[in-house]
Curated annotation (Swiss-Prot):
GO terms for cellular component: cytosol; membrane. The enzymes which catalyze the reversible phosphorolysis of pyrimidine nucleosides are involved in the degradation of these compounds and in their utilization as carbon and energy sources, or in the rescue of pyrimidine bases for nucleotide synthesis. Belongs to the thymidine/pyrimidine-nucleoside phosphorylase family. Pathway: Pyrimidine metabolism; dTMP biosynthesis via salvage pathway; dTMP from thymine: step 1/2. Its EC number is 2.4.2.4. Homodimer. This is Thymidine phosphorylase. It comes from Escherichia coli (strain K12). It comes from the Bacteria. The lineage of its organism: Bacteria, Pseudomonadati, Pseudomonadota, Gammaproteobacteria, Enterobacterales. One of its GO terms (biological process) is DNA damage response. One of its GO terms (molecular function) is 1,4-alpha-oligoglucan phosphorylase activity. PROSITE patterns: THYMID_PHOSPHORYLASE. NCBIfam families: PRK05820.1, T_phosphoryl, Y_phosphoryl.
Amino acid sequence: MFLAQEIIRKKRDGHALSDEEIRFFINGIRDNTISEGQIAALAMTIFFHDMTMPERVSLTMAMRDSGTVLDWKSLHLNGPIVDKHSTGGVGDVTSLMLGPMVAACGGYIPMISGRGLGHTGGTLDKLESIPGFDIFPDDNRFREIIKDVGVAIIGQTSSLAPADKRFYATRDITATVDSIPLITASILAKKLAEGLDALVMDVKVGSGAFMPTYELSEALAEAIVGVANGAGVRTTALLTDMNQVLASSAGNAVEVREAVQFLTGEYRNPRLFDVTMALCVEMLISGKLAKDDAEARAKLQAVLDNGKAAEVFGRMVAAQKGPTDFVENYAKYLPTAMLTKAVYADTEGFVSEMDTRALGMAVVAMGGGRRQASDTIDYSVGFTDMARLGDQVDGQRPLAVIHAKDENNWQEAAKAVKAAIKLADKAPESTPTVYRRISE
């Protein structure tokens, strides 16, 4: 039996906590026997004193074990359980292609996703722009879809890592969100509760990233890889670029449209293709579905070329109560904005810099995201045909096409787009889409 205040005192004085102490505290968070003040105090001591790798692993596993951990053995699946997690960005629609692509190559992806957070779009919000799409199937249905289709994308239920929800709510109001051991545990508790064999992390870098600097993004990626492997899940991370909108679109329905076009081959943004392929390659290699980069890429290209990946996406949408002919007729089903009109730069030039965070917030301001949990989303608004870094823009080539609910909405968005995109006399040097791969 431990006392919460003694655990806080021990960490306050700079000592490492034992696995038993950490489990006692996390179980107390779940059971409401630990007060909000005690959660806040421990969070602040961790913020200032950090945690050793064994402490980080213990914290993550205790939070994972505070709820249900999915077990797939009874389904006798003939492939690995794999997933991807992104720290979030703008136009980051990779999950919608990656899940079906990896499933078409023999993986099983029980992806538990989130809503939009701040300037970043949420995979669940995007999928809910599809009429009827059910993000909360019951457990039996979820398992059926995984077995039959190979991929399902659902919302977090209250039974998964419940201690994280309470811990995070307290961190959010006590300035202790940006602590690497706490971020790592929060991300991984939910992911590891999926019962994975392998995980790839997409850690964003740049103006639209969660972490403000390259060094902090790198530190987070290294922490996640170390902790997840310590918890027994084969994990790698990619540091990918978020200095510009990743896809050609940003919003909800507009990104789903781009995802379908990507899968069918109608249109593929080259940077989105690079990042999606790189993440899928990691999943295939970690999941032992391919022995190396070349074999993984060949398999992935094949399921894009032969239509299998698009077919899996269509089957997932139908299995989650969306239209059965969605891939063939997406334009019929996705909501469209009242006003669709391009915005042009005031001068000619080359796109040299993009405040990606500001562009994400502009989508939120249009109604495409939430400022508070109770807000409703306008799924139709957003941007398409986004100019990329290095593009020449003028009276013919717009900065973006804005999908707005009315003229006022369009004007506000146009102002935001112009303010977020800087022009120069010559094109900037191109930056990589993937900066670094991190493994154990």
